């Protein structure tokens, strides 16, 4: 917990207004909304088809309150989208066995780590500020593409990982400029190296196959949405946020498991 004087963060909105992002007692204003996202995803897995209308309304209300105070857009949009998807699935009884949408969800569940990792990493490695659309996207993502490109250009990738000297917001001064990598995929590849990254990739592929085999569409959606969020947030290996990383260690010996 930090004093408010240490965390007075502002952001310019799309209409030019300056928005104060309340940290709500934490170091960063994005902390509590991201915790809420993973709690919500975990709640979806535990409650699955038992989720009620009251729960949807209550979670939507909490999501809006957090967005109003913190202006954390990614979490706000992801939670709203997931609630819409869950309601749509409930209305039309969709799971992995559904002909068209089921196949799409099956593909995303199995290959989402590979797809989102490639998209996130390549967008940063090949970032070109002279490209108008990439420059605009970088601005919308609060400079994440530029920071990722700088990290790759400075350190490159290694087999076993390396020490990367980051400079977060609390350490910025006249001598140290901000330097962060928010993409969970790129950060793991830079910090932990290619070998561990490949093991994690294989783990999520194996996990996705088991989820589809069990027809657990709710766990599959939770994994997909968490991996989308990891594209712009460094939560892949952070157990303070992401509980789903533990599923990679599941040995599949319990044949009666209803989850995987």
Labelled PLM ranges:
Residues 1-132, 150-156, 174-259:
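Hydrophobic transmembrane helix bundles of membrane-integrated enzymes that assemble
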Residues 170-172:
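Serine/threonine-rich, low-complexity intrinsically disordered regions
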Residues 135-148, 159-167, 176-185:
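Extracytoplasmic catalytic/substrate-binding loops of multi-pass membrane glycan-assembly enzymes
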